[in-house]
Amino acid sequence: MRKIIHVDMDCFFAAVEMRDNPALRDIPIAIGGSRERRGVISTANYPARKFGVRSAMPTGMALKLCPHLTLLPGRFDAYKEASNHIREIFSRYTSRIEPLSLDEAYLDVTDSVHCHGSATLIAQEIRQTIFNELQLTASAGVAPVKFLAKIASDMNKPNGQFVITPAEVPAFLQTLPLEKIPGVGKVSAAKLEAMGLRTCGDVQKCDLVILLKRFGKFGRILWERSQGIDERDVNSERLRKSVGVERTMAEDIHHWSECEAIIERLYPELERRLAKVKPDLLIARQGVKLKFDDFQQTTQEHVWPRLNKADLIATARKTWDERRGGRGVRLVGLHVTLLDPQMERQLVLGL
């Protein structure tokens, strides 16, 4: 049985700012773009969250909820430095590390000899070491599979951890709401509830054929997760090849103005996700995806070295006009393909 730890730093960007400037510790702060530039919140500290300020929220809305919010532009060099230090701490316990972003990672400690092989004690020690060396807090989840470790890391935030032992998995899944499973959004959750499926226990009683017919390949993933099955390895060589964001509408849209409005809402989230993965990364291409009411989908990409909203909107409009054919649109997505690190290195060396 595997021993997987998911470590998630607590409001990471904001925590670095509060550590480096103690005057910020007890006041609402957020990292994000300005209201004038239609920016979006990247991270908010817990005092700000008490006012309802959340990640991916438009800055203007955040300032309405919390007029005295202190808005910071972000210091990504400082965040990267802290992230690299945290990664080095992880490496003291295992070489099997899969970073998901600057502030979270999976660790496979199945074969680790530290702490007598106890994943629970390893997680506690890692969190304490991070605090001792960086004055930052982390939350952790421990479980025999990746998706449960990720869910567990959110159970006792901030600065806590939650353990799901192999023996506890069946009971934990029985009452686990389906929206806790990564990949189940509001639209999927609503469709599942319409089928009478609210928990993993409900899905366990459902015929796999029905799920496949209703949700395609995601139906199988949903069924497997509800059984506690997740065979994905912690991949130390994992390379993030793309970053994307998409929205499935509750009802199909038929007018370009509706599509453009969705892109306007998606774009700040794409910016936020890209910054979280690697703020200074060059991109190779950016593109759009439309999925139609007959479940056919089309993707259009352009070579573009930096994220550009105007180009994405123009690409989406061209795709809408040329490929929709009168069909309703049920999903709109934006994505960027990241530059191969070796190519990026060559470009840097060539300057």
From Swiss-Prot:
It comes from Shigella flexneri. It catalyses: DNA(n) + a 2'-deoxyribonucleoside 5'-triphosphate = DNA(n+1) + diphosphate. Keywords: Cytoplasm, DNA damage, DNA repair, DNA replication, DNA-binding, DNA-directed DNA polymerase, Magnesium, Metal-binding, Mutator protein, Nucleotidyltransferase, Transferase. One of its GO terms (cellular component) is cytosol. Its EC number is 2.7.7.7. Residues 4-185 form the UmuC domain. This is DNA polymerase IV. The gene is dinB. The record marks 13 as: Substrate discrimination. Poorly processive, error-prone DNA polymerase involved in untargeted mutagenesis. Copies undamaged DNA at stalled replication forks, which arise in vivo from mismatched or misaligned primer ends. These misaligned primers can be extended by PolIV. Exhibits no 3'-5' exonuclease (proofreading) activity. May be involved in translesional synthesis, in conjunction with the beta clamp from PolIII.
